[in-house]
């Protein structure tokens, strides 16, 4: 009886290991946008940008995740970048749909004359 249970467990574990090895890790596409705002921007203008960007997930179905924050690095290597937004998509088609979406175009109009510098970085990450 003990040998039978051991063999069944071994087969189940082997099957799980094979299934896991055959399945590719699921990835998501992260779209990172960082800003340095112009020195003459008011706190209200910066908040307008934050609110406009933060509203995009409700307007663009392709967005599956959204995060934002301000720089708190102690390293002093941010080159003046103060705000970061991370938008997550399931694939490149989602990012492409977002970039040409009217809500994105409207957001760009809000931010374009308030930013001094923008850095955009896209990468594939393991889905959680």
Question: Predicted segments — roles?
Answer:
Residues 4-7, 21:
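N-terminal compositionally biased, intrinsically disordered segments and leader/signal-like regions
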Residues 6, 35, 108:
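Alpha-helical and His/Cys-centered functional microenvironments
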Residues 6-16:
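Bacterial N-terminal signal peptides
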Residues 86:
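Short, structured active-site "lid" loops
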Residues 111-120, 124-128:
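C-terminal partner/receptor-binding element of secreted or periplasmic proteins
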């Amino acid at each position: 009886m003990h040998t039978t249970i051991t063999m069944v467990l071994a087969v189940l574990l082997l099957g799980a290991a094979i299934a896991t090895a055959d399945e590719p890790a699921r990835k998501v596409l992260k779209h990172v946008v960082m800003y340095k705002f112009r020195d003459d921007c008011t706190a209200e203008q910066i908040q307008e940008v934050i609110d406009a960007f933060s509203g995009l997930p409700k307007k663009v179905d392709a967005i599956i995740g959204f995060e934002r924050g301000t720089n708190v690095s102690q390293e002093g290597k941010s080159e003046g970048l103060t705000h970061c937004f991370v938008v997550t998509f399931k694939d490149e088609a989602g990012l492409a749909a977002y970039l040409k979406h009217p809500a994105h175009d409207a957001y760009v109009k809000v931010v374009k004359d308030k930013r001094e510098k923008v850095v955009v970085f896209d990468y594939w990450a393991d889905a959680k």
